[in-house]
Amino acid sequence: MRIALVFYLLLGLLGATSVARANEDGAAPKKLGEVAFANSCAPEAQESFELGVAWLHSFGFVEGEQAFRDAFNRDPNCAIAAWGIATVLIGNTFSIGPSPEGAQQAQQAIDRGRTLGAKSQRERDYIEAIAAYYDHFAERPHGARIRSLSDAFEALAKHYGDDDEAQIFSALYLTASQSPTDKSYSRARKAAAILEAQFAKNPNHPGVAHYLIHSYDYPAIARNGLPAAFCYAGIAPDAAHALHMPSHIFTRVGLWRESIETNARSIVAARAENNSGSVLHAMDYMVYADLQLARDTDAAAVVQQSLDLSDPGLASAYARAAIPTRYAVERDQWSEAAALAGPPASKFPYTEVMTLFARAVGAARSGNPAGAEKDVARLAAIVVVLKGAKNDYWATEVEVQRLGAAAWIAFAGGNREEALGLMRSAADMEDASEKSAVSPGRVLPARELLGDMLLESGRADDALAAYEASLVNDPKRLRSFYGAARAAVAAGNRDKARDYFSLMVEMADGNSTRPELTKARQYLAAK
């Protein structure tokens, strides 16, 4: 792939290519895909501006900001660079937005762009559209600001119907403002329709492939994202995020080996970018996939590597807590889960809950339900804090984990009906929403845990139904396959037992020593 960032410039201005600049500096050009963003900046600013747009589309925010500021340095009248700076300072639109300091810097850029006065109405409209995100910044949460940004860019795209970049950014913000409880995925589907047309027109555009993956990052429509997932890493192979993003779709459809491979490449690229946050995020997806294949040795190595990393961002704080937690619970090592150390301090309390949840469930399932009470109380306190902060999404996610942990305490105490009621409530609540984009999946799906509890209660048919329902949202999970196989055996359903044991053996690597795989092979050999 080459970086061919061809721009159709307003006022007939033509800038030098990135390849030329790279050759002059003696460095290889970055392979970031092909984009086209008409602008009226001076020729000497074109290359930096186009590089900034390319990095922006692959969420290379540090590099993008540097490039846009360089465009300003080369042409102090390049007002559209203000739009670029304000846009990259939002950061990942699927996360939590900039700090107040970042917002202040963005507002300064917007004010500069307004003062300069862009040479075209279109450029002035871009600056005003991004300003919609920062209006009344301190008074609104990120979600409300993203909705305003989406509305502004939807109007911009409608007004400039022939502007591909306006259509592409409008689609991104449509998906970013998709409600996690809207199971019709209306905004994401609308975005996908825009992007599919762009994909046919601009197949090497990094943002098109990238945002298609986000638009299809939901269980019911994930397979539609496979073409973009298989293309994106090749479009922008020098961007760590572009190498990671295909695993969002691979995880949704259970392509575990593909997820491991693309995240391994992403980790190498992220280290080269000195981006520990991206390293941790890719590691979380990688360890999740390793554990579905029962590659426990590989997963353990990732756990150890993750312990040496830290980053203040949400995705990395989440990953830093999730990785060792997943390693314990995916292997049903409940005593190990009960002994998990707390994650590093984070400004995001909902990243702490994974460890609390795993410790509580681990203690309850390893014979020490009293030892789980403190962690459940802490989960309840975090729910109160999040509700007070009007962080409804994460308050609900934490409440699911509180209910699940409380269910296993009740179950260990012999209160089976109470336990099953709590566990069903957790599963229903979780199913009503979607996982966050910061995560490959919840620590353990609540409906999968309901299957565990039903199976241990001697209700094999109900357990089988729970596991199969869990597999709809979280396909090809090894624990769900094993649970479904055991439930089928207990229910006397030999055909389904054989099917699920076969799926386990076919999916997991042959050299795994997990006892559940040994049992699967023994069952298949005996029948």
PLM features: what roles do these ranges have?
Residues 41-70, 127, 131-142, 405, ...:
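Alpha-helical segment of the N-proximal tetratricopeptide repeat
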Residues 44-48, 203-209, 237-245, 276-285, ...:
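Generic helix N-cap/helix-start motif at coil->alpha-helix transitions
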Residues 50, 84, 127-132, 169, ...:
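"A position-specific structural signal for the A-helix of alpha-solenoid helical repeats
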Residues 55, 89, 132, 174, ...:
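Residue at a conserved register position within TPR or TPR-like alpha-solenoid repeats
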Residues 73-74, 157-159, 199-201, 230-238, ...:
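Solenoid-like repeat scaffolds
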Residues 79, 86, 90, 98-118, ...:
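TPR/TPR-like (Sel1-like) alpha-helical repeat modules
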